Regions:
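N-terminal beta1-alpha1-beta2 module of alpha/beta enzyme domains
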Residues: 1-89, 190, 394-396
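Hydrophobic faces of well-ordered beta-strands that scaffold small-molecule active sites
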Residues: 3-7, 59-61, 91-94, 122-126, ...
Length: 396
């Protein structure tokens, strides 16, 4: 199991005002932040990413827009800085919200450029984007997945074509001459990732051989992984753990109490992330008819719910760190505690090859974040690399 550190790079000083307004995203005015303070935080967060390279961790960066929960507005921009400040860490963009961008060829150019700059260390996430990203992108949710798959195919073709310009005449994108310079070091393309938490996502990723990742989804991850493995077998190949990724909040300390304290602070991201004005939570057409029917049948739920290992639902907004641990969205304690929790999780999931380590969030201090990264990198991550493939998967 490889470990990829990430942080949302939040502007947490504005959270109290956003919570009072009932929305931290889309319609929360930027007058509630101090640009100089934002700059100080961004430089601090970049220092924490650089530390990962020193302790043997890989790095993941994501992006969001019009929100106090994430100040990374451009994955390529952040990764270009990190690529210059690191030497060995692999760098994952998770990801590029291609359905919300008008320029998939530009995405391919940016990723190829980063692959050259980093010496071939880039991995590429092509993601759908959250529902509250639709309004800032001025995007049509009803056509989202059609745009996504066309952009996906165009990005991959642009990255992998080296024999001269090709034209593209699609439903949403038209180009006379696609011919990206420079081309990526990793051929035909750097590794491609997708994200989601549904069986359909698992099947779609398996059909393309992509890595599939899921964020803070608890038990919902296992059916997606199983669907991936099943579809791969139907297509005549075996999907190993290296095709599966899982993102979780992790707090490590010299004592169990210290680890839980750090995890509890980081978990404030999960408690605040769903706080968005209702019109932006489920834009018409964003979810399928079947998904909307299922949500209606489940009854009114103002915020996304997850369940613990006994099927008991918890509310993100009010859950304790112990409740989050019961859902396996949080792992916390001493290095031994965290390793044993992740080892058991890996066994239950049938083998997960990539751990996305949410190691900083909320008001966690710079010193706490550095200690969390260092302890995990030195005392947990090396042992995770030695985890064996669960028996039931190895036998398939």
């Amino acid at each position: 199991m490889r470990t990829w550190y990430f942080s949302e790079m939040a502007y947490h000083p504005a959270w109290e005002k956003g919570l009072a307004r009932g929305s931290l995203r889309v319609n929360f005015p930027s007058e509630n932040m101090d640009p100089r303070e934002a700059g100080t935080l961004l430089n601090r967060y970049l220092d924490e990413f650089a530390l990962c390279d020193e302790v043997g961790l890989d790095i993941m960066v994501n992006e969001h827009h019009s929100t106090a929960t994430c100040m990374t507005v451009s994955v390529p921009m952040a990764l270009s800085i990190i690529a210059r400040e690191t030497k060995t860490a692999r760098l994952l963009s998770l990801g590029n919200p291609i359905a919300n961008r008008p320029d998939p060829v530009r995405v391919a150019e940016e990723m190829a450029w980063l692959d050259c700059l980093s010496g071939g260390r880039i991995e590429i996430g092509l993601v759908k984007g959250a529902p509250y990203e639709i309004a800032p992108a001025n995007s049509n949710p009803g056509r989202l997945m059609r745009r996504y798959w066309e952009a996906h195919d165009l990005v991959i073709k642009a990255l992998s074509t080296t024999t001269g310009p090709f034209s593209w005449e699609g439903e949403f994108y038209q180009y006379r001459a696609v011919n990206i310079w420079p081309r990526p070091i990793q051929q035909p393309t750097p590794p491609i990732w997708m994200t989601g938490m549904s069986v359909d996502t698992g099947i779609a990723a398996a059909e393309r051989g992509h890595v599939v990742g899921t964020l803070l989804s608890g038990g919902l991850a296992k059916p997606m992984y199983e669907a991936y493995r099943k579809r791969a077998r139907e297509l005549g190949w075996t999907a190993g753990p290296d095709r599966m990724a899982y993102a979780a909040i992790i707090g490590v300390g010299n004592t169990r109490e210290e680890g839980l304290r750090r995890a509890n602070i980081i978990a404030d991201y999960v408690r605040t992330s769903p706080v968005v004005a209702e019109p932006f939570t489920n834009p018409p057409g964003y979810n399928s008819v079947a998904a909307n029917v299922a949500m209606l049948k489940a009854g009114p739920r103002p915020h996304r719910m997850i369940t613990d290992r006994n099927g008991v639902p918890i509310d993100h907004r009010t859950a304790t760190v112990e409740q989050f641990m019961d859902t396996e969205t949080v792992f916390a304690g001493t290095p031994d505690d965290v390793f044993n929790q992740l080892k058991a999780f890996n066994q239950r999931m049938g083998g997960v090859g990539h751990l996305l380590f949410f190691g900083q969030g909320g008001e966690l201090t710079h010193q706490d974040a550095k200690a969390n990264i260092s302890l995990f990198g030195k005392e947990v991550a090396p042992r995770l690399l030695q985890l064996e493939v669960p028996e039931q998967v190895a036998a398939e």
